[in-house]
Structures are given as structure tokens and as C-alpha cells.
Amino acid sequence: MNPQAILARILEQHEIPYEEMIELMRAIMSGNVSPVMTAALVTGLRIKRESIGEISAAAQVMRELAVRIEVPDASHLVDTCGTGGDGCNTFNISTTSAFVAAAAGAQVAKHGGRSVSGKVGSADVLEAIGINLDQTPDQIARSITEVGIGFMFAPNFHHAMKHAAPVRRELGVRTVFNILGPLTNPAGASNQLLGVYHADLTGVLAQVLLRLGSRHAMIVHGSDGLDEITLSGPTKIAELNAGEVREYSVQPEDFGLERAALTSLQVNSTEDAQAMLLSVLDNHPGPARDIVLLNAGAAIYVAGKADSWARGVETARDMLASGAAKQKMQALVEFSNQVSA
């Protein structure tokens, strides 16, 4: 395996064969490819546009090298995670939605880290509300089983990423590493709501997840660039369910919700993001609550806790109105600090 030769082929717009991509990723993740060459390779792949096979191979390697979390019954296990890198600087929509989905009976294996390209990452806001991020795999497995939700702080589970992390940080642009995070859930969640930073990635990642054995997933991209289901206009969806992929688009009006500008959801600090998350869990009406209804409804649906997305949205509404979603957040704060004491 010759990284220079692979780079030359990438620059000529050639796809890297699956087995060769596996070998290349193992070399990168073991520190056997220099930072300069790693940066050139991932930038070249980005310009060429990563193929289904290349992404699948890279994700397979990251999954192999990840610290695993074993959950006894994973049938309703779901992750709500985005690629980030959308530049929209919204509050943590998928993180807030995770509490709502957990309140509805989904088992949420939330996977995330600190912000790389946005204002506030999921780990930043969860830490701000009092959740202890430093938990062992066994403790997180218990959290998922007993509380219904657990948070996996990505750096604690993807130790091999330490070789690529400085490159990713210094480049400061979207690369295959943005795509890989949501594809490498340490608990192996086979149900997923996955937001992506580019519309072209919806169908691509649906095919990747199909190859990787996912059960029910929705890959979403808002027309405003948001890596979530958006309120400002249409959202492009690629839905993988029972081995088949269907592509379509939805609008807020399809669920009886009003459109709202992206600016109404943007934050400038962790404090702003925390305040908006808590406002939604307190069931305060407005665009923040509405966008969580849309996204949590989808998560509830893919987790198998509603037989349609529309019913998932109504269940999400009930979870916020009853206070069950806020109670789920409080339960996770309490559990994470008990087990870490």
C-alpha cells in the first residue's frame, strides 16, 4: 500500500477499491501515514467526492477500532447525530431531540463530541447542563438500559482518531472524518436519524448504511444547508428501511408546523445553546420547539416507537407537554454523576 500512489489516483478522479481503502484507513488510524499525507488524501477525496465504497471501507475500519458498548437488546436503539460542518450555528437540535425520543421509549445511544466547525457541540451543551462525560463503556451501557439514554463522548471511544484529529482540526474544512463520526456509533445503533451537510450525501450515506447493516435510518439535509430536518423550507430525505432506500422531501406544513427562519434557531455560545435546549424541554412554544418536534418525531419513528413519522411528531409533542422529556434529561444528569462518583 503506497499512499503517494493512492493520492495520485485520487487526483485523477479514480475511486479507491474497497480493500485498498481498508488498508489505507488502517494505516492512517495507526499513525503510519504522515499528517501531511493524511491531509492531502482526505482533501483529495473531498474534492473528488467520496464514493459509497470508500466511505463504507473507512467506516468499517473505524468501527473495528472503536471501543464497543454492549447493549443487551438493541432493537429500539437509535442515534441522533449529524455530520456537523453545516456552518449554520444552530442550537443542539439532535441532542435535544434525543431526550424526547428517550422519553417516548426509544433507547438512545447518543454519540458526539465537542464542536469542530460550529459554535457548540453536543458534548459542550451536555456538559453545561451537568452531564458527566467521563463514563466507562459499562456505565454507559447501564445508562442506556436503565435510563433509556446514554452519551458516548467520541474521543473516549475512537482512540485511533488521535492520529487524524490534529489534521482535521488544522484543516478546518469538511472531510471524510465529518462523515465517519455518525457512521461509527460504539453501541452499534442500527436505527439512526443522521443529518448531513450536503444534499448529495443523503442517498450516498443511505447506501453506506445499507452496506453496514443498518435497519431503519433517515439521512436528512435541509434546503437552507442545515444538517437537520429544517423549518425554513423543504428537507431532502433518504430513508433506509428493511433493506430498501426511498428518497423524498418534506416540508414543515406536512406536519402542521409553521415555517421559521434559521436565524431564530442560531446561538453564539454554549450558554445560549443551553438556554434554548432547556426552553424546549420546558415546552415553550416557538421555532425551537417545532424543529425538535420534527426531528424527535423522526427519531421516534426510526426507533420503532411510532408506526409513522407523523405519529412520532405527535408522540414528541406529548413527551414535551407532559414534562417526560425534561425528566429524562434530569435522570441522565443524575445517573451520569452517580456512576462517576
Swiss-Prot record:
Metabolic or biological pathway, per its Swiss-Prot or TrEMBL entry: Amino-acid biosynthesis; L-tryptophan biosynthesis; L-tryptophan from chorismate: step 2/5
Cofactor note: Binds 2 magnesium ions per monomer.
GO molecular function list: anthranilate phosphoribosyltransferase activity; magnesium ion binding
Residues binding Mg(2+) 2, per UniProt: 227-228
Record keywords: Amino-acid biosynthesis, Aromatic amino acid biosynthesis, Glycosyltransferase, Magnesium, Metal-binding, Transferase, Tryptophan biosynthesis
Binding site for 5-phospho-alpha-D-ribose 1-diphosphate: 82, 85-86, 90, 92-95, 110-118, 122
InterPro entries: Anthranilate_Pribosyl_Tfrase, Glycosyl_Trfase_fam3, Glycosyl_Trfase_fam3_N_dom, Glycosyl_Trfase_fam3_N_dom_sf, Nuc_phospho_transferase
Binding site for anthranilate 1: 82
UniProt-recorded name of the protein: Anthranilate phosphoribosyltransferase
Gene name in the database record: trpD
